[in-house]
Amino acid sequence: GLQQHANYFIHLYLDLTPETIDSQYVHLAQFIHPNAHIEFKKQLAEHEKVVKKLHLSSRFDIKHLTTNVAKQTVTLSGRLVFYQGPSPQGAKDKTFVMQFSNKLGKPFILKIAEGNNENK
C-alpha cells in the first residue's frame, strides 16, 4: 500500500523536465489532501518556476524506503540527479518524508518534505 503510493508520487514529484512538469504536477495535485492543497500548490509553483527558468530536469533514484504505518509516513532516501538540458549538473543524497491520510479508503498526501539525510 503506502510504499507503492510513495514510490509513484515521489517520481511524479521529482522525475521531471520543463516539458513534463505541468502534467505531472496536475496529476499529483489530484492526490493531495484537501487540507494541504493551498500550501502544496505554493510548493509546486516554486519548483515549477525554478525548473522552467533554469531548464532543469531531475531524477530521483531510491536507495532506501521505510514505512511507519502508525504515523502513515514513508521515508525515501536516495540520490537526486540534476540535468541542464542533456548535461548532468550534479547529484545530491536526499531524504524525503511523505505523510498520508486515508480518505474513503484512498491515501491522500498530506505532506512531502525534505528530511534529515542519515544515509550518506
Annotate each PLM feature.
Residues G1-H11:
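Short, low-complexity N-terminal intrinsically disordered segments enriched in polar/charged residues
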Residues Q4, L14, E19-K120:
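Structured, amphipathic secondary-structure segments that form assembly/contact surfaces
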